[in-house]
Amino acid sequence: VTASSDPKFFSNGLDLDWITSKGDHEGGDRRVFGDEAMKLFARLITFPIPTIAAVNGHAFGAGFMWALCHDQRVMRRDRGMMCANEIEIGVPIPEAELALFHHKLPRHAFYETVQFAKRWTGEEAFSSGFVQELADQDEVTSKAIERAEELSRLGANRELFKWQKEHIWGSDAAINRTDGPAHMLHNNGDYPHPPRSG
């Protein structure tokens, strides 16, 4: 289970000020950060046990992407939104991230998400099928833990569970083939990058 201690945010994504700032930075080497983050997402999407995101508040940009990398999502019923707002802030969505959205979201939700930066409420995300359960604010994490406990038996054979994940999500029925999101996330540098705005 991935959860946040912040009552308002699950994850607000990347620190854009840090990513776009010039010169050396105490936060580390920004040149490798994008590819390393994508590899982390690739690891989670194929993790050999069931994974649940306890989305207790807003999940924007890479925070939305992180939530989608989990097998299931429990989201707060009354507040919080999921949104890929890159187009609004002038940041292109890399092909690997587009592949993840394409494979994890229903077709109508994919286009609304990436082209129009739709802000999905919990109710809308649940109705669209990419959130599996809604909960009140003080129950999001406990409901996610309950769901994880229910699904934990499926991770008893980790090798099989991982293999199954790798063969579900790709458009060619194998997540790690060259058009599958896990392969693209892991090898993000091999794909064309969209133009930078500004």
Predicted regions and their residues:
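Short, active-site-adjacent cap segments at secondary-structure transitions
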Residues: P7-S11, F60-G61, I168
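A short acidic, glycine-rich active-site loop
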Residues: S21-D35
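CoA-thioester-processing core
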Residues: L40, L44, A54, F60-T113, ...
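Well-ordered beta-strand positions
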Residues: Q72, E112, F116-K118, E124, ...
